[in-house]
Amino acid sequence: MAILQIGAGGVGWVVAHKAAQNNDVLGDITIASRTVGKCEKIIESIQKKNNLKDSTKKLEARAVNADDVDSLVALIKEVQPDLVINAGPPWVNMSIMEACYQAKVSYLDTSVAVDLCSEGQQVPQAYDWQWGYREKFEEAGITGILGAGFDPGVVSVFAAYAVKHLFDEIDTIDVMDVNAGDHGKKFATNFDPETNMLEIQGDSFYWENGEWKQVPCHSRMLEFEFPNCGSHKVYSMAHDEVRSMQEFIPAKRIEFWMGFGDRYLNYFNVMRDIGLLSPDPLTLHDGTVVQPLHVLKALLPDPTSLAPGYTGLTCIGTWVQGKKDGKERSVFIYNNADHEVAYEDVEHQAISYTTGVPAITAALQFFRGKWADKGVFNMEQLDPDPFLETMPSIGLDWHVQELEPGQPVIHKLK
């Protein structure tokens, strides 16, 4: 058995550690990135933490350009993995999927392939490119598992669990995400700044009463009491799982909400207003061409540097309302992750941890034959039970909280 992991950023760091802790099932591990030194640094951390469960299995680093399909195919054929885990940014999904198809090797990723905030991109079309591989993967005899992070990912499994065990009829699904931790910086992003800044400035899309609704970013807000984290303001955002849930789970409204503090939004609004969040090329007075967003990324702290000293909890979950046995029911299925616990385990913070742990939990379902049908699947389509039985042993527990049924108070902001 063997896996090939592509990507050595924050999520890749956690994925590699968790793969190493479970290499008795996953087998040999190869970590590949454009910068092989980043892979080697992860391997050093794994060895430092004694996280390689079976020392007889390989743990190696390789260099690869994830945009180059031919190079990817060559690496896959060299490594001969049973599964390729894509821990890279969303824009490499399609090249890696194509390489897996050509090499006839199964595939897993943690986010949708498109930037949901780019001009003209809309949530209703978010998965079109990747869903186009359904028949190809089935004919090739391989498995594709899409969006196996936390959100998307675990929140979709929570929704599937609610459908299977807790409800007869679903009215609303609200994905709730807040980071109540403190990294001690005035402003920083918890994962790749480019991805993060693009994600939170785009219009929000949500599903309501049989149609898609589109509103400006940060224009819909509600306050929610998060278990162990207290009350936080959360804002409606475009997000991957809204599309996949709408495809596979009948509900009257489906929406994603993320928490932002007032200070964070103040910094964000200033940077957006002066053009620092633009990905478009800009020519300076000396002829140098730069992208403002790339300049900002270079100025901000590396997300991997935030882990030491990061304190506090995250809370991410799926709030489902509907009916069971003819009675109204409201439940919040959630996880709390602790930044300090994550650092002690894998030398990283809880944001990356909550993405990396589910990816390996899903990979284990594939290797154990629980999630190994041929074709391309989103997490809502797969049996939630074996995944949720496994996830606590990999590092993330989960809970079901009963709430008082009732429609959330959504504030419409200017």
From Swiss-Prot:
It is an enzyme of class 1 (oxidoreductase). Its EC number is 1.5.1.43. Activated by dithiothreitol and inhibited by SH-reactive compounds. InterPro entries: CANSDH, NAD(P)-bd_dom_sf, Sacchrp_dh-like_C, Sacchrp_dh_NADP-bd. One of its GO terms (molecular function) is carboxynorspermidine dehydrogenase activity. Optimum pH is 7.25-7.5. It catalyses: carboxynorspermidine + NADP(+) + H2O = L-aspartate 4-semialdehyde + propane-1,3-diamine + NADPH + H(+); carboxyspermidine + NADP(+) + H2O = L-aspartate 4-semialdehyde + putrescine + NADPH + H(+). GO terms for biological process: polyamine biosynthetic process. It comes from the Bacteria. Belongs to the saccharopine dehydrogenase family. Carboxynorspermidine synthase subfamily. Involved in norspermidine biosynthesis. Catalyzes the synthesis of carboxynorspermidine from L-aspartate 4-semialdehyde and 1,3-diaminopropane. Is also slightly active with putrescine as a substrate. Homodimer. This is Carboxynorspermidine synthase. It comes from Vibrio alginolyticus (strain ATCC 17749 / DSM 2171 / NBRC 15630 / NCIMB 1903 / NCTC 12160 / XII-53).
